[in-house]
Every structure is written in C-alpha cells, then in structure tokens.
C-alpha cells in the first residue's frame, strides 16, 4: 500500500485453459498426525474468451492431542496428552478475470475463518493444574478489484480498490478453568483502500506517471476506555 523501493505486490494467479477446454478441477486431501485432515478444491471455469473465474476452498482440522513425557516432582516419569490444542480453519476464495478491448479487469473475494484453543503448561509439582480452556476465533474478509486500460497511445490508467474486515474474539472463562481470570474480548478492524496510477508517454524514451492513494483504517473494541484508532 505504500510507495517503497522494496515493496512487493502479489497478484492472483490467472486461470490457463488448453485449447477449447472450459474447466480445470483440482481436488486434494492431506492428512497427518494428531487427527490432521486438510481437504482442498480448486475449480477454474471459462465463460467465454473474455471472462473466466476461479473458486478455491480449503478446510483444515487437527486435534493437537499429542503425547509427551515429563518427570513429576518426587515421582516417576509420566506420559500426558496435550489438551485444548485443536485448530479448525476454513478458507474460501472467488475471483473473476475479464478482458476489454484495450485492457483488463479483475475482482476477488476472500474469507478466512478459524477457531483454536490454547493449551496450558505442564507443571511438575501439580500435573494438570493449568487446564487452559482459552479459545480464540478469527475472521478475515476482503473484496478487491483492479482495472487497467490503455485509453490512448499516450495515456493509460491503473485503478485498484479494496475493502477489508478483520475480527478477533478471545475468551478465557474461569468456569472452565479456575486458574484464569475472566476475559472476553472482541476486536474489529475495517480498511478501505483505493489507488489510481496514470501513465503519460510523451516520447518512446520519455514517460511520466502520476499516482495517488487513499487509505482509511478504523479499529474498534468493546473494552471500556480502550483507545479506538
């Protein structure tokens, strides 16, 4: 979002179709230890020669219940299982790509949602003392678009726009874990970003650019007396 010599700008991958093919489909499933499962799907579709789209989704779950060994105070080594270490995650993406006579446009929507637990520490003196039933929920959403067109041989325009919404909920409930204090925090952040870049070609060896950006970010929390930027 900022002008910098070291800035890196990544762009969404465009679908590629061979010949008259109109669909690309990729389905995958990964698995691992601790009941980990990770299915995914990518579907790319070509409506016509000018418009195409892609849908990408992924889900991941792991229980986080792995066994570990530690020595108790004045006792023998024991084996325990980590608790409250589960993670659930869902990602959804939908993008459209279009061509116009002298340019192109792109639009994308993205959603990420997750829930996870925070496992507690293993204490030698009192095994199982800290249950740590803390939980956290996250939601990240954004929609963005881009438009580029060569209006004249000497003038072109690139415009971008984006809206983003981020949400975090953290809960620590002493009714589930008496060793903790009650914490139930919500945080929300919204962002609007827009930019336009104009390119003027005066001579083949001489060109000028003019660009401008607008960005507005707001943050909110339900906590009393907490600063809201």
Predicted stretch roles:
Residues 41-45, 92-98, 143-149, 194-200:
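Residues on the lipid-exposed face of transmembrane beta-strands in outer-membrane beta-barrel proteins
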Residues 1-28, 37-43:
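N-terminal periplasmic accessory domains that precede
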Residues 206-229:
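Signature of Gram-negative outer-membrane beta-barrel scaffolds
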Residues 33-36, 50-65, 84-92:
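Gram-negative/organellar outer-membrane beta-barrel architecture
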Residues 27-31, 41, 55-61, 107-113, ...:
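Transmembrane beta-barrel strands of outer-membrane/channel proteins
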Residues 2-4, 30, 35-39, 86-90, ...:
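Residues that define the transmembrane beta-barrel architecture of outer-membrane proteins
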Residues 21-25, 37, 49-53, 90, ...:
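Outer-envelope beta-barrel architecture signal
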Residues 62-68, 79-89, 102-157, 163-189:
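Flexible loop and strand-edge segments within Gram-negative outer membrane beta-barrel domains
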């Amino acid at each position: 979002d900022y002008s910098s010599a070291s800035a890196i700008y990544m762009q969404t991958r465009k679908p590629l179709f061979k010949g008259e093919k109109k669909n690309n489909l990729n389905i995958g499933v990964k698995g691992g230890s601790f009941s980990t499962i990770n299915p995914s799907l990518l579907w790319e579709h070509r409506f016509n020669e000018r418009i195409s789209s892609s849908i990408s989704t992924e889900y991941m779950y792991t229980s986080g219940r792995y066994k570990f060994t530690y020595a108790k105070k004045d006792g023998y080594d024991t084996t325990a299982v980590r608790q409250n270490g589960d993670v659930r995650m869902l990602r959804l993406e939908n993008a459209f790509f279009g061509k116009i006579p002298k340019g192109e446009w792109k639009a994308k929507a993205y959603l990420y949602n997750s829930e996870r637990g925070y496992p507690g520490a293993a204490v030698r003196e009192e095994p199982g003392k800290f249950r740590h039933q803390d939980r956290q929920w996250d939601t990240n959403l954004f929609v963005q678009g881009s438009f580029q067109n060569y209006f004249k041989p000497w003038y072109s325009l690139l415009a971008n726009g984006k809206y983003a919404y981020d949400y975090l909920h953290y809960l620590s409930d002493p009714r589930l874990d008496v060793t903790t204090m009650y914490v139930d925090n919500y945080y929300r952040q919204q962002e609007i970003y827009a930019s336009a870049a104009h390119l003027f070609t005066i001579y083949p060896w001489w060109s000028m650019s003019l660009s401008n950006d607008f960005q507005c970010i707001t943050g909110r929390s339900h906590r009393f007396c907490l600063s809201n930027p």
